[in-house]
Amino acid sequence: MISSSKLKSVDFYRKIPRDLTEASLSGAGLSIVAALAMVFLFGMELSNYLAVNTSTSVIVDRSSDGEFLRIDFNLSFPALSCEFASVDVSDVLGTNRLNITKTVRKYSIDRNLVPTGSEFHPGPIPTVSKHGDDVEENHDDGSVPLSSRNFDSYSHQYPVLVVNFYAPWCYWSNRLKPSWEKTAKIMRERYDPEMDGRIILAKVDCTEEIDLCRRHHIQGYPSIRIFRKGSDLKENQGHHDHESYYGDRDTESLVAAMETYVANIPKDAHVLALEDKSNKTVDPAKRPAPLTSGCRIEGFVRVKKVPGSVVISARSGSHSFDPSQINVSHYVTQFSFGKRLSAKMFNELKRLTPYVGGHHDRLAGQSYIVKHGDVNANVTIEHYLQIVKTELVTLRSSKELKLVEEYEYTAHSSLVHSFYVPVVKFHFEPSPMQVLVTELPKSFSHFITNVCAIIGGVFTVAGILDSIFHNTLRLVKKVELGKNI
């Protein structure tokens, strides 16, 4: 068995009796300075160990979501009706998707962006296959021409007033005209305005009655509206819509539709309507249509990772639009690319790279307003977006790799005057390259080694300085004593 005396012989730290040591003020001061230096350097080393150290490189895009890219958006149009608002997607490969509805929701709003009801559900609008009679015949005007002066009186005089808002330059309006006039004559013969008066057909020339058409928010021609007791508003689950006709436009189809409108109306309703006309009190539930009608469009679309565009416009396969009356001013609440990041993932992103994330939703909060007028008519608003993907690879306590993918983009917008119907275009161009940010792990053993080096180094340097200072003072004293002798 090894004796204790032999173990003591390998002691690196032999003790000197305290009685044989001497303390000094200079040594005490230097010890305090050394202790403070140790604490300061230890804090700096600990901060450096806890800090994130990353490396950044640019590589070819290696997205985990394949060749498709998700676009989330929330846009508010104070002057574009949900009735005709359409979301279209196209790209350079020839993809052309029109009027996307599966992943898009629409909400009617007023000019102040306040919702006026629940989600807009236009219902199944049939495809108009008959835009008029096959054989065009010359018919005398059977419908009543209306203007701003007599519109209100007619709408309150008859239980049902069906109005064709048209434009003489519109191809579809001209196709409808013969069958509309013929239908109006047939309904006059069946329901004489003087004797029966349950229904009457009328027309409004929107090129002459601009304010009247704007008051009823007519954006497409022809628009056939049904007015009951002075209003064309109908309530559907708390949502107010304009009651419109979307069916075929030949005489037979029009007459059949008109018959359904008067089927449940008693014959003496015309007299009751006249009595209601004399009563100046207005039913609050039958308020007139708002001066403007807007639409909030939100949802997402999936596009290929090639240059393309998302277009929002007024679209219909059986209506024409006056470009000077279409205003695509809009507010951007959200327009972002890629999957939505959770709060936890976003904090992880900011921890690794504080400068990333500021352009994830670059257009959010921006507004693009075009004032209505001749000078600002036919204005298309275009946004050019260049997208760059950032991928972060991080090692945490779970010892598992986590991939955080985030898309950022730059945006340049412009207002373009055109002869065509104004639209909003979001041109996007994904970059074939991506930024790869990798967190570099730090060794705990390296941290301990540095801490030991700091403590030992400061202690050793302080000891050397104290020895030099002490020996210098002793030498000076010897010299002074030698001079006095």
UniProtKB/Swiss-Prot annotation:
Q: Where are the transmembrane segments?
A: 444-464
Q: Which GO terms describe its biological process?
A: intracellular transport
Q: What is the name of this protein?
A: Protein disulfide isomerase-like 5-4
Q: What does this protein do?
A: Acts as a protein-folding catalyst that interacts with nascent polypeptides to catalyze the formation, isomerization, and reduction or oxidation of disulfide bonds. May play a role in storage protein biogenesis.
Q: Where is the active site?
A: C170 (nucleophile)
Tell me the organism.
Answer: Oryza sativa subsp. japonica
Q: Which Pfam families match?
A: COPIIcoated_ERV, ERGIC_N, Thioredoxin
Keyword Signal annotated: yes
Q: What keywords appear on the UniProt entry?
A: Membrane, Signal, Transmembrane, Transmembrane helix
In which domain of life is the source organism classified?
Eukaryota
- InterPro entries registered for this protein in UniProt: Erv (IPR045888), Erv_C (IPR012936), Erv_N (IPR039542), Thioredoxin-like_sf (IPR036249), Thioredoxin_domain (IPR013766)
Q: Where in the cell is it found?
A: Membrane
Topology class, membrane: Single-pass membrane protein
Thioredoxin domain: from which residue to which, for each copy? 114-263
Task: Identify its protein family.
Answer: Belongs to the protein disulfide isomerase family.
In the UniProt record, the gene name given for this protein reads PDIL5-4
